[in-house]
Amino acid sequence: MNQKLEQVQKEALALCAPVFHEMEEISLFNTEKVLTAFRKHHLSAYHFAPSNGYGYGDPGREKLEEIWCDIFHAESALVRPQFVSGTHALATVLLALLQPGDTMVSAVGAPYDTMESVIGITGNAPGNLISKGVHYKEVPLKGNTYDLKAIADAVDENTKLVEIQRSRGYMLRDSLFPEDIKKIIDTVKAKNPETICFVDNCYGEFTNCLLYTSDAADDMQC
């Protein structure tokens, strides 16, 4: 290889080294956290055996959900192959928590495109939230990120649920860091402590060394 190219390669690797090191540290931290949960809950080959669940329960699924709770500091979890997509999981949560007359607020601009029909923003899908009498508010972004003042203004005594989407999805806004999510949750709870803070944490699992949203959010979808 040309000596000049070799030098460029060395300089590029040296420049990237701190980032690679940080990624390795995050990976090691989270791998250790998962393995610790495996040991704590005595995961074994027995739990990977197939089961029809008929009359006997499903120990593998139950063990997986125990481990998931431990890793994310949750009270309970649903980790099931019956959820065919993230939209399916999100819709399940929203349809379970929201009743006619309740108000839902999307705190970080518009949600995923696929959620628009679930909420009833577009189309006329049977059973969408708006058709069931759920009120919907959307807090516009401030430039390329969230607006805490606007979020506070959107929350009142009638706000049942605030959805916080961590990933930018198909938009060009910034994705949220755990610190950002905590600020939004604190803002919502200061305005109405009874409001449910629901975090869509899709693509955000195991990407840092913080316990983050699970310590502050009421519900979280991963």
Regions found by a protein language model. Name each.
Residues 31:
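Active-site rim recognition segments
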Residues 52-60:
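N-terminal small-domain helix-loop-helix segment of the aminotransferase-like
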Residues 62-63, 88:
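A generic alpha-helix surface/boundary motif
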Residues 63-74:
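Long amphipathic N-terminal alpha/beta scaffold segment
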Residues 212-222:
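Single conserved hydrophobic/aromatic residue that forms the stacking wall/gate
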